[in-house]
Amino acid sequence: MTPRALLAVVTLSLAACTVASKPDGNGSAMVAPDSMESVVKRTFTTYGFRLQSGQTLPEMTLAFETYGRLAPDGRNAILVTHGGTSSQHMAGKYSPTDPAPGGWDTLIGPGKAIDTNKYFVVSSNVLGSSYGSTAPASINPVTGKRYGPDFPEISMHDIVTAQRTLLRGLGVHRLVAVVGPSYGGYQAFQWSVSYPDDMAGIAAVITAPKGSGKEADVQALVDRFAKDPNWNGGWHYDRGGIPDTLTTLRIETLTRYGYNEILAEKFPTQADRDAEIRRRAEPWAKEFDPNSMVTMRRAAVRYGAEKDFSKIRARVLYVISRSDKLFPPSIAPDVMDKLAKAGVDAKYFQIDTEFGHSATGVEWAKWGPTLKAFVEGLSQ
């Protein structure tokens, strides 16, 4: 990388966290301690970021958060990668008055499966996403206007290379692990084949080593957006966006992800559950750029790590939810067989749950000890 490309602007204020509990040491009988507080939103910017396609982003920013502290030798870092429609806010709160902590707060923190008393955890917003990283809604510094639908095509390799650039900027040169659910699991697998010497292990959760769907599915998504009168060929920004279309899409997604089952105890009637799912869908629909959905979906359908399994040097923990409709347990035997044939040290764990694709946070107690033991075993 050129000296100019290494020029980066990083907000270096560390995320403060309360350290109120001691690690349990054996990965069993875990109790989720209180949430961390005062998590700080941070950004990293570099210049002249070259994509796999040969195109270059003149300026590339990643939004990120950190939990815990980096050891003096820089070798205690864990990268946590997020799902496709979620954000980098994986643990803690920005303010004590926030209604809820980050999505994996039950798993990340002092004494938890990913123990911030031991590890420096980095969670960055995916390149192309809608939560602060360079994406279609960003201003192109060359034109002074949003990229919009003209945003360059990116690959899963580009996504993890951007993360690697961030980590280098933070002083991290080798990871203990890359851990992530769903789209984050795609990234974990991609890390293991793109940069096999950069981590001791990966935990790929409710995911697969290859993308689902085809290019036609990307076009079908665009066609669906095009039915909204505000779409305007993707230039929807000055027309108020397409929140109604995105709300409907989000409701479908949350339902498919298992939210009916998750909400059943608190909301016993279907009408109440439907109302709660809509309540959760509407804010997301106002902030997520549909062009980001297209960009990330295209990267996903073109993604495939299986052909490069022979490159993997990291240990692998592969986790699937028994009731997941997106990545059902039926895919696991083939994945594990291919990993074994490639000589990969891999372990499989199935979460026994009715909560489908959304099980990992709410069912933390069922698989958190396995994750904790795996991560801590990487340091031995």
What are these regions (language model features)?
Residues 19-80, 84, 88-89, 93-94:
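Catalytic-loop region of hydrolases
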Residues 65-140:
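N-terminal cap/lid subdomain of alpha/beta-hydrolase-fold enzymes
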Residues 142-150, 157-177:
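Conserved acidic catalytic loop of the alpha/beta-hydrolase fold
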Residues 174-213:
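Conserved hydrolase catalytic core segment
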Residues 198-283:
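Alpha/beta-hydrolase-fold enzymes
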Residues 312, 318-320, 324:
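Short beta-strand/loop motif that positions the catalytic acidic residue
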Residues 325-334:
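Conserved alpha/beta-hydrolase "acid-adjacent" motif
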Residues 340-380:
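Catalytic active-site module of serine/aspartate enzymes centered on a nucleophile-bearing elbow/loop
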